[in-house]
């Protein structure tokens, strides 16, 4: 880690089709081995699936899903006097959004299904409807933070 100055935040450019930064953030997380065009193709086909299944704007559904999956608090392990406490910490919106995207993709990968396109589209739709593993993960994180609220003064 550099001691000179804080690293600049990298600005995420919007994607070419939807002109949205959120879509590009999702593509960058889908990306494997530098194959960005494949990641774009997967996401755009998933968005097309969402449009056919819901008859609504897929970008609206995606935004809604990520908004509902974004956590407000997280727990951080903090060692105090030989024992480790899970300390609840409020997180910034950008960090919460990144967590929501990560949870969305891991939940989609764990789903049963033929291919990743259908799994991803189904997970996005389920998250937008307040069901699915992504929402369960968010609620579990909030529950953890609530149960460890007594350790909040260890920040």
Swiss-Prot record:
Q: Which InterPro entries match?
A: Ribosomal_uS7, Ribosomal_uS7_bac/org-type, Ribosomal_uS7_CS, Ribosomal_uS7_dom, Ribosomal_uS7_dom_sf
Location(s) in or outside the cell: Plastid, Chloroplast
Q: Which Pfam families match?
A: Ribosomal_S7
Give the molecular function GO annotations: rRNA binding; structural constituent of ribosome
Question: Which coarse location class applies to the principal site listed for this UniProt protein?
Answer: plastid
Q: Which domain of life is it from?
A: Eukaryota
Q: Which GO terms describe its cellular component?
A: chloroplast; small ribosomal subunit
- Which keywords label this protein? Chloroplast, Plastid, Ribonucleoprotein, Ribosomal protein, RNA-binding, rRNA-binding
Fetch the SUPFAM superfamilies from UniProt.
Answer: Ribosomal protein S7
Which GO biological process annotations does it have?
A: translation
Family in the record: Belongs to the universal ribosomal protein uS7 family.
What is the annotated quaternary arrangement, including any partners?
Answer: Part of the 30S ribosomal subunit.
Role of this protein: One of the primary rRNA binding proteins, it binds directly to 16S rRNA where it nucleates assembly of the head domain of the 30S subunit.
Please name the HAMAP family in this protein's record.
Ribosomal_uS7_B (MF_00480_B)
Q: What is this protein called?
A: Small ribosomal subunit protein uS7c
């Amino acid at each position: 880690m550099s001691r000179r100055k804080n690293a600049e935040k990298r600005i995420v450019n919007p994607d070419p089709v939807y002109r949205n930064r959120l879509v590009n953030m999702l593509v960058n997380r889908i990306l494997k081995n530098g194959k960005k065009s494949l990641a774009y193709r997967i996401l755009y086909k998933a968005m097309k699936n969402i449009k056919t299944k819901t008859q609504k704007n897929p970008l609206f559904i995606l935004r809604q899903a990520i908004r509902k999956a974004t956590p407000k608090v997280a727990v951080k392990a903090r060692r105090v006097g030989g024992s480790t406490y899970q300390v609840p910490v409020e997180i910034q919106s950008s960090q919460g959004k990144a967590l929501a995207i990560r949870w969305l993709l891991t939940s989609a990968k764990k789903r049963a299904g033929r291919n990743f396109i259908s799994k991803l589209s189904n997970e996005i739709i389920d998250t937008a409807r307040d069901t699915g593993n992504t929402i369960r993960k968010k609620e579990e994180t909030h529950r953890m933070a609530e149960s460890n609220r007594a350790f909040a003064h260890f920040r």
